[in-house]
């Protein structure tokens, strides 16, 4: 199962961590894993490359974990928050379709 955690300080989403393998299918054929990976990649690219937020990204291949942490403030804060909120809504929808393979939490 893939675990997706969104971190908050008050109303502000400060980052996320996605870890584990969904286990829906074998590597290379796992549509749940592919959908999650695409969401993570799109969010990171939009936040850092388009918005210039300079979020810290850590990848731990040992436990298939990607963590993104926002700086204390961003020039494009509203846009960055919209990207993270959209990612969370997308992953919740995916969880509703494949509840045995993805977990989404706000912490």
Q: What do the PLM-derived regions correspond to, one by one?
A:
Residues 1-31, 41, 45-107:
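N-terminal intrinsically disordered, cationic/polar leader segments
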Residues 32-36:
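Short, conserved glycine- and acidic-residue-centered signature motifs
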């Amino acid at each position: 199962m893939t675990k997706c955690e969104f971190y908050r300080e008050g109303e502000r989403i400060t980052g996320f961590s996605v870890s584990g393998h969904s286990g829906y299918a074998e590597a290379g054929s796992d549509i749940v894993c592919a959908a999650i990976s695409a969401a993570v990649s799109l969010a990171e690219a939009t936040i850092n490359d388009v918005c210039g937020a300079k979020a810290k990204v850590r990848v731990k291949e040992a436990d298939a974990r990607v963590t993104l942490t926002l700086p204390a403030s961003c020039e494009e804060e509203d846009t960055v928050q919209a990207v993270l909120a959209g990612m969370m809504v997308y992953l919740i929808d995916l969880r509703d379709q494949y509840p045995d393979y993805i977990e989404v939490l706000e912490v």
